Amino acid sequence: FIAASVIVLTSSFLIFELVASDRAMSAYLRYIVQKADSSFLYDKYQNQSIAAHVMRALAAEQSEVSPEQRRAICEAFESANNTHGLNLTAHKYPGLRGTLQTASTDCDTIVEAAALLPAFDQAVEGNRHQDDYGSGLGMAEEKFHYYLDLNDRYVYFYEPVNVEYFAMNNWSFLQSGSIGIDRKDIEKVFTGRTVLSSIYQDQRTKQNVMSLLTPVYVAGQLKGIVLLDINKNNLRNIFYTHDRPLLWRFLNVTLTDTDSGRDIIINQSEDNLFQYVSYVHDLPGGIRVSLSIDILYFITSSWKSVLFW
């Protein structure tokens, strides 16, 4: 009788601990998603800030490009891997930080762009150095920014991109909807808004990513798009449980595109006995966040209770 009572008592205590842990961790998973959502909102704000800076530069009265600058641009203009532009294989044009790729073989077509794009460099640099203020929103890292000009058919990457590894040859990718956004949707639906793309395979990295797209307008007409790629490493930094590093070992985190079915597996538990806590949340744009914790986390974090049982 005494042995049975002890078993009942210790089992009741263990069940109580398990239920309490379930409630606490369910609330914590909701907190993780809320923090990630805040990080996405901040990324949207930064993208909009960059796009606004570019639009102001486009709207300002442009002085004519000097003969010296035009000569420097055309001397640095090069062709490689069936594409053309500036800083394709090495940093030959110091006026731009990154790489400009274009479908045109004529350097005169990108002279004005090369004179304008330092405004994009300044905007990205300024936004990257904004303080986090201890919010832990994953803002300290440097995500991949670029500007796509739909009218003049060029793309400018803030980070240098070696054309031997990636060349923008598919200039109709937006119209084909390969990133989940069609040009007609941009023109009709999200004037001035930042849109989250579907999850798609990035041509540059061959990995599943999603992008934030902010339109750039001139005189009310769509001219280009400022893009920010969010990849698996970015998402790991956003979702990482800094205050509970042990939990990360037993946490499953996946983003799934509800339309295409593509996913980004952000983290997987080291062991998978069975899930004892899970949480699913749908973000705007058809992106589903799925989180779950393996039972081994409870056993590891509550080992004294398990040992007592």
Locate each region found by the language model.
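Extreme N-terminal signal-anchor transmembrane helix of membrane signaling/transducer proteins, especially
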Residues: F1-R23, L307-W309
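Juxtamembrane membrane-water interface segments immediately C-terminal to a transmembrane helix
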Residues: I15-Y45, A51-M55
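Extracytoplasmic/periplasmic sensory segments of membrane signal-transduction proteins
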Residues: R30, K44-S172
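Extracytoplasmic/periplasmic ligand-binding sensor regions of membrane-associated signaling proteins
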Residues: R128-D132, G136-V226
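Hydrophobic segments of polytopic membrane proteins
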Residues: R183-I186, G192-I199, N234-T241, V253, ...
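Extracellular/periplasmic juxtamembrane segments that couple receptor/chemosensory ectodomains to their
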Residues: P215-V218, I230-N233, D243-W309
